[in-house]
Curated annotation (Swiss-Prot):
Positions annotated to bind (6S)-5-formyl-5,6,7,8-tetrahydrofolate: R23, E84, R123, K461
Protein name (record): tRNA modification GTPase MnmE
Residues holding K(+): N226, T245, I247, T250
Keyword Metal-binding carried by entry: yes
Keywords: Cytoplasm, GTP-binding, Hydrolase, Magnesium, Metal-binding, Nucleotide-binding, Potassium, tRNA processing
Positions of GTP binding: 226-231, 245-251, 270-273
Signal peptide: none
Pfam family, one: MnmE_helical
Length: 461
């Protein structure tokens, strides 16, 4: 694929909206803009100034009123000459404007090609490019803050610092291969290597939280029919997503929606009440409920606190034996939050389970009481600790894996040096560590990987 031609794409989401934007980037961006856009006030284009006019077709017929701006490279997103045309947000209008740009000499952009050009032109590195996608797909304010911090360059700066720590020992090892008679202070190799290993280990450890914030987790709501699972789902989502009736068994299939709980995007699965049934549809729903529990990172055992334990509860509780589980005592509004009843229910269910639950929370899906505590408890069990104050977490599994390999190679080099391994073998590990870091920043990646990464972007980004 060429990267020195001019591309165009619709940069706004499909469908109707207030405006639609067509983006053009490449060496002929201004020429194409001048062919299809006629400003009301003629004159030379001044970069970064919005102009009002009309988009016209090849015959001069007006396509739509528009606002257009031209940005001179490298002071643009792609670091190339770029034009953006804003028109009315009807899908037909926006598509017609795009077709005029293509007819005037632009090529239809591939998914993520604008961001790829920003990377290839050195405006951002690969970690920052991937952060752009994370900003678009962020489902919680915490995930958004982490993505914005990565786009701001903290990870790139830290990796360049670590790379520099590895480069000096590599230079010493290379010199010792060529000039073995030279003497090197051991601290000149051991000190930066130790610092690099510690820094890489810290980044890898941060991914345990960061990936959850970015990708989310899964939680299954399980319990008897009419325990209030669907009502609780609706309350956590703050919308009426699941059908709720007083009739037990209303939910006969699993239903999934994503909620932000304690800053963590959690896919909540509302399951059918687990009971013995001769109804084939209900039995299928129960089977899917069991599957949902198996796939979940966490289970919420939803209990109607006003009712005593029943025989059906034993089978339900058994599903939680190998799963982190929150005993969620619902409908506390029916018992006026009577502590003696709450304690009795907790004791009864723990006796059935044979051990304590990972947490117990009292809630009322009807009044909203306890929902914030439930969300915080879910986040605590998933994360184990609150987010770092500076928000500097590795959030991408690809980055974590590459940095883990870098840490292993750097550690092997450090251990090898302490054990007197020859400099040429140390250089192999140091080079491998530096290359693994380059897989994150983009300094040592192939074209296939780049296409795999950028193909996940939408067209126009």
């Amino acid at each position: 694929m060429l990267y020195d031609d001019t591309i165009a794409a619709i940069a706004t989401p499909p469908g109707e909206g207030g405006i639609g934007i067509v983006r053009i980037s490449g060496r002929d961006a201004l020429k194409i803009l001048e062919r299809i856009f006629v400003p009301v006030r003629p004159g030379r284009w001044k970069p970064y100034q919005m102009r009002y006019g009309r988009v016209v077709d090849q015959n001069g017929a007006v396509v739509d009123e528009a606002l257009a701006v031209f940005m001179r490279g490298p002071r643009s997103f792609t670091a190339e000459d770029t034009a953006e045309i804003s028109v009315h947000g009807g899908p037909l209008v926006v598509e017609r404007v795009l077709q005029q740009a293509l007819a005037a000499g632009a090529r239809a952009a591939a998914p993520g090609e604008f961001t790829m050009r920003a990377f290839l032109n050195g405006r951002i590195d690969l970690a920052q490019a991937e952060a752009t996608l994370d900003i678009i797909t962020a489902r919680t304010t915490t995930a958004l803050a982490l993505a914005e911090a990565q786009l701001g360059g903290w990870l790139s700066q830290e990796l360049h610092r670590i790379r520099d720590l590895l480069m000096d020992p590599l230079a010493y090892c290379t010199a010792l291969v060529d000039f073995p008679e030279d003497e090197v202070d051991p601290q000149d190799i051991e000190t930066p290597l130790t610092a690099a290993v510690q820094a890489l280990d810290a980044l890898v450890a941060s991914a345990q939280h960061g990936i959850i914030y970015r990708q989310g987790a899964r939680a299954a709501l399980i319990g008897r029919p009419n325990a209030g699972k669907s009502s609780l789902l609706n309350a956590l989502l703050r919308v009426d997503r699941a059908i709720v009736t007083p009739i037990p068994g209303t939910t006969r299939d699993t239903l999934e929606e994503t909620a932000s709980l304690g800053g963590v995007p959690v896919v909540l699965t509302d399951t059918a009440g687990i009971v013995e049934s001769d109804d084939p549809v209900e039995r299928l729903g129960v089977a899917r409920s069991r599957q949902a529990v198996r796939l979940a990172d966490l289970a919420l055992l939803v209990v109607d606190v006003s009712l005593p334990v029943a025989d059906d509860d034993r089978e339900i509780v058994a599903l939680t034996e190998e799963k982190r589980t929150i005993l969620t005592l619902n409908k506390i509004d029916l018992i006026d939050a009577d502590r003696s009843i709450i304690a009795a229910r907790q004791r009864e269910y723990e006796q059935i389970r044979g051990k304590a639950f990972d947490a117990m929370v009292t809630v009322s899906a009807l009044t909203g009481q306890g929902l914030d505590e439930l969300g915080a408890t879910v986040a605590r069990l998933l994360l184990g600790a609150p987010i770092a104050a500076d928000g500097r977490l590795v959030t991408n599994a690809r980055h974590r894996d590459a940095l883990a390999r870098a840490a292993d190679h750097a550690r092997d080099a450090l251990t090898g040096f302490q054990q007197g391994v020859s400099p040429d073998l140390l250089a192999v590990d140091l080079t491998a560590a530096i290359n693994a870091i380059g897989e994150v920043t983009g300094e040592s990646v192939g074209e296939d990987l780049l296409h795999a990464i950028f193909s996940r972007f939408c067209i126009g980004k």
